[in-house]
């Protein structure tokens, strides 16, 4: 059976020795399979490899059939989100970090080679991860790479004071909130910051978005799951003379003032992730997050 993916990119976490060693091992293995390999610029610079083809993330997205991302979940988030902005290139995650919730292939040498071989032959399962985009006060000038989130868009207090939000969904008034902020999360992000704030876990294939209050000053404030086709308008009120911060996937902070409006909706692009054929999302929930474990 011929390989389905012939031009393979490797993207690793910068300045991490164990990742660089894994990249070198991967390169040798893929070369043995007769595949064409391109390594991301910074990733290649961290290795001892010479005379290898290198490229930026944008070039990789446009030139390669598949990208292998080596590192932790944070590195996977950053790389896969940027790759998806430029093409529909599928991504494979190899865990060399701590949790490994998104990077689902273990770095064990023999098992990894077998798993990679099967996936590159096309014997895999696929998850399509939706993303969110935002704009402030209808300003469309923000750089694309700084306005798209794979996990969540969060509006939080920049100082130790609660602040107020007024939320509209599809042009209809939904609720007011005073507290430490609000998280608007994708299904992928529902197991990250949103879960820590008390939000529900959403299946990655669910066409939903969840709004999760952060430390709301109310006994009846609860997370809200809505269609990912909805448009969310969030207004910063003047309560407590606020200065709040908008962040995407924990990065690219934007300072917000009273009366500014943040509009959030589903992005056109999705991240395509390849797993082994027997991948089970619920296994990952149990093994990585201790979900639904019997205590006695």
UniProtKB/Swiss-Prot annotation:
Annotated NAD(+) binding sites: 73-74, 78, 151-152, 178, 180, 191-196
Top-level taxon of the source organism: Bacteria
Localization terms from the record: Cytoplasm
UniProt KW keywords: ATP-binding, Cytoplasm, Kinase, NAD, NADP, Nucleotide-binding, Transferase
Entry EC no(s): 2.7.1.23
GO MF term (any one): ATP binding
One Pfam family it belongs to: NAD_kinase_C
Catalytic activity: NAD(+) + ATP = ADP + NADP(+) + H(+)
Gene Ontology terms describing biological process: NAD metabolic process; NADP biosynthetic process
Keyword Magnesium attributed: no
GO cellular component: cytoplasm
Cofactor(s) this protein requires: a divalent metal cation
Catalytic residues, chain numbering: 73 (proton acceptor)
Function, as annotated: Involved in the regulation of the intracellular balance of NAD and NADP, and is a key enzyme in the biosynthesis of NADP. Catalyzes specifically the phosphorylation on 2'-hydroxyl of the adenosine moiety of NAD to yield NADP.
HAMAP family linked to this entry: NAD_kinase
Family from the record: Belongs to the NAD kinase family.
Protein name stated in the entry: NAD kinase
Organism of this sequence: Francisella tularensis subsp. tularensis (strain WY96-3418)
Gene responsible for this protein: nadK
């Amino acid at each position: 059976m011929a390989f389905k993916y012939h031009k393979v990119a490797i993207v690793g976490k910068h300045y991490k020795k164990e990742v660089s060693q894994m990249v070198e091992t991967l390169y040798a293995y893929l070369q043995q399979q007769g595949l064409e390999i391109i390594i991301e610029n910074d990733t290649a610079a961290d290795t001892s490899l010479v005379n290898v083809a290198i490229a930026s993330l944008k070039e990789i997205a446009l030139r390669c059939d598949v990208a292998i991302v080596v590192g932790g979940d944070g590195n996977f988030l950053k790389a896969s989100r940027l790759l998806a902005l430029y093409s529909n290139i599928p991504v494979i995650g190899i865990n060399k970090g701590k949790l490994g919730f998104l990077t689902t292939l273990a770095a064990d040498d023999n098992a990894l080679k077998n798993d990679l071989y099967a996936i590159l032959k096309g014997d895999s399962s696929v998850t399509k991860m939706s993303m969110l985009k935002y704009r402030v006060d209808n300003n469309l000038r923000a750089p694309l790479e700084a306005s798209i989130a794979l996990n969540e868009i969060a509006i939080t207090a920049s100082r130790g004071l609660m602040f107020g939000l007024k939320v509209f969904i599809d042009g209809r008034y939904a609720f007011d909130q005073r507290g430490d902020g609000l998280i608007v999360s994708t299904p992928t992000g529902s197991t990250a910051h949103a879960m820590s704030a008390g939000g529900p876990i959403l299946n990655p294939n669910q066409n939903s978005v969840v709004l999760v209050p952060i430390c709301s000053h109310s006994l009846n404030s609860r997370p809200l799951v809505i269609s990912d086709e909805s448009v969310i308008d969030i207004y910063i009120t003047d309560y407590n003379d606020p200065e709040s911060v908008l962040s995407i996937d924990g990065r690219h902070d934007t300072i917000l003032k009273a009366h500014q409006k943040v509009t959030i909706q589903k992005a056109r692009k999705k991240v395509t992730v390849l797993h082994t054929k027997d991948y089970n999302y619920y296994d990952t929930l149990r093994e990585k997050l201790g979900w639904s474990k019997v205590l006695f």
